Amino acid sequence: MLVAAAVCPCPPLLVPEVATGAAPELDPARAACTDAVGLLAAARPDRLYVVGPADEGAHGAYPAGAAGSFAGFGVDLSVRLGEGWAEGGRPLPASLTVGAWLLARAGWADAPIEGLGIDNAATPDDCAGTGRELAASAERVALLVMGDGSACRTVKAPGYLDERAAGFDAEAARALGTADVAALLALDAGLADELKAAGRAPWQVLAGAAEGAGLDGRLLFEDAPYGVGYFVAAWS
């Protein structure tokens, strides 16, 4: 059963070594992520799943100890998904690498960890089904859900300006901040793809996991630096 969840954005710029001179701009987001991860620990889960978007070839499960690197962003920094050492496995996708960094930063040692890379093209029904399976995997399950909102909020955004982006992000933020499972499942997958909202599928995994759990939500951070929607929320 799902007992807690933290929702965090997943830009590598969250890592100060990657952001370099721009690092202070995301200090509020980092602080909110730290608070959200702390609430996960307070729920005393038996198992933690880190869920995030993944490109083709990086979908599926990642064991504790799986490694990720920020070398592709010009930084000699590696992280592992919790404790342990997974030899010879696939490297973590970027979203799970950022999640592993957040957990390491918080000193996570409260429950075994597994990672799950989600296909951006997964349907809402498939995502919800995955979430239900995760929630049923242990008596007390927690999720760290990585994902960004639209990437089309300004003309300088990665996806340029799309007038629909602000409304999409507002609804996503409202749903995440109120633990509105139905609203998350109702997010349009096609529109999310057009707006480059990589969080849609992971958020719908969360929605499936939270069905019937009776969790309350709280929005800890909302902003769109660089024209990309970033949200931090805590469910408990």
List the predicted regions and their residue ranges.
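A short aromatic-anchored loop/beta-hairpin motif
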Residues: 1-91
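Short, hydrophobic/amphipathic alpha-helical packing segments
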Residues: 29-41, 99, 124-131, 203
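Non-transmembrane, aqueous-exposed alpha-helical and coiled segments at domain scale
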Residues: 33, 50, 112, 132-135, ...
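Cap/lid and interdomain-hinge subdomains that line or gate substrate/regulatory clefts
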Residues: 81-129
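Active-site beta-strand/loop microenvironment that shapes enzyme catalytic pockets
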Residues: 120-169
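Metal-dependent phosphoesterases centered on the DNase I-like endonuclease/exonuclease/phosphatase
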Residues: 159-186
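Polyanion-binding loop/helix "lid" in catalytic or ligand-binding cores
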Residues: 176-222
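Short, basic/aromatic-enriched C-terminal tail that caps enzymatic domains
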Residues: 226-236
